[in-house]
Amino acid sequence: MKVPRVIIAGTNSGVGKTTTTLAVISALKNKGLKVKPYKVGPDYIDPQFHSLLAGATSDNLDLWMIPRERIFQLLADASTSFNISVIEGVMGLLDGFGSTDEGSTLDLARITGTPIILVIDGYGLSGSAAAIVKGFKDFSGDLLAGVIVTRVSGERHYDLIKKAIEDNTNVRVLGYIEKNDEVRLESRHLGLVQASELNSFSDYIERLSKVTHINVDGIIEIARASRDLDPKFSPLLSRVGYAKIAVAYDSAFDFYYEENFRVLRNLGAELVFFSPLNNEIPPEDTDGLYIGGGYPEVFAKKLAYAVDARENIAKLIKKGVPTLAECGGYMYLTRTIVGQDGIEYPGVGIVPAKTFLTDKLILGYREIVSKTSNMLLRHGETARGHEFHRSTIQFQDKVDHPFVLKYKDRFEEDGYYSNNVVASYVHIHFLSNIAIPKRFVEECIRYSKKREIS
């Protein structure tokens, strides 16, 4: 199966991968191509930018959370509706688990036969750029098909870098992005700001286009040389019945995996999005609640003033609506949240705890082992996901945590569970254990039937 595709990888984090990926997507769209974006790894923020620009959801390709056959399936899905796929890498090209390249962008490129375009930072470089590219070429071989240079001072500077690389490495240099602070994406305590928070994303893309000078035809040629895919298709899951699941989605809650939404829909769920931040309430006939991660600590004051949203969510949960809350959603369900301003604000009040920020970033892959048989997992069953926060939850009542999280060197209890609520700091990827979304939808269907009878 022909699926033209290319990976935009970096020498390291902060080199301009996301900016370059957006520049490439924009240039391909301007050629009239339909672009399918992807992100290597567990990131929730970069895909928002991809999706907004491409007009198509950006899927995560994560070799640790997602079984390999599903990775091939996700890539093959692009063959029917898109002309080309652009995959943004994660961290540096070879950065994987520990000191190995397992799970890295290069690992994904090898497994899927996808050519790599390497992004290097040209600031303060000329001939030395060749040594950088040669080193990466030694590790990646023929998969390294091109280079794009960021933070270039002008055409003459670019010509020096281009000649040095092409004369010494036989790797094509496909263009550059000028050094310009106006196209640098801002950051906050958990990474880049969200796409929804840029004042005008279209203006940003226009500014980026003006300082981007890339060989689009060369990128298309490289993408078309990708190895053919031979995915083993199997249905993600067949429909189990209808349920209406209300999903909290706004600037405070938008750390979700698009693949999770797709699986829920395949099972028969109708997803209805609402904004707690804007004091929107879930529909009265809601059969389930899904409250994902995000930045409730940044918007704690506004969430506190959104009284209708908080009270209606609490009311639905107390009525027995099956509820899945992850990270920021877990924080929101607590009694109080200490915001970034240090002030304590009311949360939904379901979880008997207080949330506050710390200076410590907790980040990484997690394997969940269930200590209980609950709505999502049976005792001893596992799932995989990602943890990403600077907050901690301090329980005010004694609770039995439903999960044990496996770290590299230790185990730690996590989460909150009641009859109809499962909450955890971990963003679970449903493709790591497809029993989870199936059970969630089935619980929602059971609740729907009980609600209709009453």
Swiss-Prot record:
The record marks H427 as: Increases nucleophilicity of active site Cys. One of its GO terms (molecular function) is ATP binding. GO terms for biological process: cobalamin biosynthetic process. It is an enzyme of class 6 (ligase). InterPro entries: CbiA/CobB_synth (IPR004484), Class_I_gatase-like (IPR029062), CobQ/CobB/MinD/ParA_Nub-bd_dom (IPR002586), GATase_3 (IPR011698), P-loop_NTPase (IPR027417). Keywords: ATP-binding, Cobalamin biosynthesis, Glutamine amidotransferase, Ligase, Magnesium, Nucleotide-binding. It catalyses: cob(II)yrinate + 2 L-glutamine + 2 ATP + 2 H2O = cob(II)yrinate a,c diamide + 2 L-glutamate + 2 ADP + 2 phosphate + 2 H(+). Residues 244-435 form the GATase cobBQ-type domain. Pathway: Cofactor biosynthesis; adenosylcobalamin biosynthesis; cob(II)yrinate a,c-diamide from sirohydrochlorin (anaerobic route): step 10/10. The active site is at C327. It comes from the Archaea. Its EC number is 6.3.5.11. It holds the Pfam family CbiA. Comprises of two domains. The C-terminal domain contains the binding site for glutamine and catalyzes the hydrolysis of this substrate to glutamate and ammonia. The N-terminal domain is anticipated to bind ATP and cobyrinate and catalyzes the ultimate synthesis of the diamide product. The ammonia produced via the glutaminase domain is probably translocated to the adjacent domain via a molecular tunnel, where it reacts with an activated intermediate. Belongs to the CobB/CbiA family. This is Cobyrinate a,c-diamide synthase.
